[in-house]
Amino acid sequence: MGNNGSTRAARKPSGKPSRKKPADGVSRRALLIGGGAVAAAGTAALLARDQVKRLWWQVPGVEKPRKPGELDYAGATWVAASEANWRRADRPDDFPIDRVIIHVTQGSFASAVKVFQDPAHQAATHYIVGQDGRVVQMIRELDVAYQAGNRSFNERAVGIEHEGFVDRPKDLTKAMYASSARLTASICARHGIPIDREHIIGHVEVPGTDHTDPGPHWDWDRYMELVRRAAAAPPSPTPSPSAKA
């Protein structure tokens, strides 16, 4: 987990976090909208009306439409995190997404859900995966979760918590590995993230963090192979994002 923190995550000496300048979506100069019409540059319009209807939300500062309880991953159940534990954003148009960060909860599935709903915790991840393979989504992927202890990595990453403790290898179950791998493959497909260890990382690998999860017992070779297999499998017919009542 990140703090910004964690429940009781193992820690290491801290360093200085890096910062990254946000990337805009469509340039303000490239997309001119006024009174519902497209501004003309010389004799040619910059964009046709039908393009504007599709792209208006990509103008920096304009958000995509949202629905309560909307999911980015069809295999998850929605449980909302406290708004104090994340920041509203419009990714990937304001911040490109190019990392998946693997965390371990240092506690139970229920305790992780509880602390992410606590505004005093000041940290959360987008997803939690249980030892039985269940997945809960608590923050939309387009929003910034306070997960990594590093602003740049918060803005560029999707975070996944895994139920258990870093010093208990038995907590890293077959069902959890398989479920998490399917989730990570789905995230990578949505955002064009390469499936490699440069882009799928542990919390311990975030610059400046004081955490050590997912710990020495996390089997990276096994996990990456499962992610690759999941990515190569036929896609689910269920569209994403989806919404559950």
Region roles according to the model:
Residues 95-96, 155, 195:
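Structured loop/turn residues at beta-strand edges in well-structured enzyme cores
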Residues 94, 119, 148-152, 168-179:
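Extracytoplasmic/periplasmic, Sec-exported soluble proteins
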Residues 151-162:
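Short coil-to-beta-strand
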Residues 2-13, 18-26, 35-36, 44-78, ...:
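Basic/polar, cationic surfaces and motifs that engage anionic cell-wall
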Residues 104, 162, 204:
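A cross-domain feature marking catalytic cores of carbohydrate-active enzymes
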Residues 2-149:
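N-terminal catalytic cores of peptidoglycan-degrading enzymes
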